[in-house]
Amino acid sequence: MRSLLLLVLISVCWADHHLSDSYTPPDQDRVIHIQAENGPRLLVEAEQAKVFSHRGGNVTLPCKFYRDPTAFGSGIHKIRIKWTKLTSDYLREVDVFVSMGYHKKTYGGYQGRVFLKGGSDNDASLVITDLTLEDYGRYKCEVIEGLEDDTAVVALELQGVVFPYFPRLGRYNLNFHEARQACLDQDAVIASFDQLYDAWRGGLDWCNAGWLSDGSVQYPITKPREPCGGQNTVPGVRNYGFWDKDKSRYDVFCFTSNFNGRFYYLIHPTKLTYDEAVQACLNDGAQIAKVGQIFAAWKLLGYDRCDAGWLADGSVRYPISRPRRRCSPTEAAVRFVGFPDKKHKLYGVYCFRAYN
């Protein structure tokens, strides 16, 4: 009995001596570090962070995944591939495409336009056909195998042009929702900050603040001056911040891209009222052109015409790609005459005929 008691005392003393350095009181947090021996078992990569195309074109969003074949459980689970689109404010993800084995599902406006490239067993690249203006943005490729998953993000850029817009009512008359619809009405979408920033780098200078797709209000200045941010300030995109989308009123910056059709100035023996202009285009198998179409023709096709003409929103404009005397002598631009009385018989008309 004494031998047993002595053995117990020795064991308790040994344990107290060896565990005292690592003991953590119950009221203190403990951090446990776990390190994988061979790194991640599943890796997803995009060969390009950004890809470029245009409206009506096709594009491949690159994405590949790599598995560790020696890892426990590798190959047991089916691979699940999911593509989502990130909203401009990064607060939501919009489902685009999901694939698991033979099961595939496409969502929303992407139905019939997207599929996996399938170039190899580890290829998760997504092909998008017949691109629309709304397809612009950032996409997330997510690959899942059992409990393992990884993601990569690819940005889809569209060739196009940013233009400022305000309606007949005048400047600073659009809340966010009206601004977005105004762009859609002119064959465009509300521009993102990245698109406005690229336009500013390309020389866009506009002294009126406008809505962007993330709900912010900004304007681009390449030539600082007193009424536009101050004469002694540096060039840049001025940021008014985020405003109430229902109550606050500003202009809007729109974005449009290539079109599938013909934009042209209608040769007509007389000048036209607005209603006569609309009918003249219809008689020619076309429709009166929209503001987005005149900007796309000017910027992307180099369209040049020194004749002021009616457009669908009731404005009168003309596009100049080759500045010259009496035709925008200082710069290439789409010149804005205004929103004249629609009964004035003083202008021609720009038409647009879509290709089937």
Swiss-Prot record:
Ubiquitously expressed. Glycans are attached at residue 58. Residues 1-9 form a propeptide. It comes from the Eukaryota. Transmembrane segments: none annotated. InterPro entries: C-type_lectin-like/link_sf (IPR016186), CTDL_fold (IPR016187), Hyaluronan_bind_Proteoglycan (IPR050691), Ig-like_dom (IPR007110), Ig-like_dom_sf (IPR036179), Ig-like_fold (IPR013783), Ig_sub (IPR003599), Ig_V-set (IPR013106). Residues 40-154 form the Ig-like V-type domain. Disulfide bonds join 63-141, 183-254, 207-228, 281-351, 306-327. GO terms for cellular component: collagen-containing extracellular matrix; extracellular matrix; extracellular region; synapse. One of its GO terms (molecular function) is hyaluronic acid binding. This is Hyaluronan and proteoglycan link protein 1. The keyword Nuclease does not apply. It is found in: Secreted, Extracellular space, Extracellular matrix. Residues 161-256, 261-353 form the Link domain. One of its GO terms (biological process) is cell adhesion. It comes from Mus musculus (Mouse). Keywords: Disulfide bond, Extracellular matrix, Glycoprotein, Hyaluronic acid, Immunoglobulin domain, Repeat, Secreted. The gene is Hapln1. SUPFAM superfamilies: C-type lectin-like, Immunoglobulin.
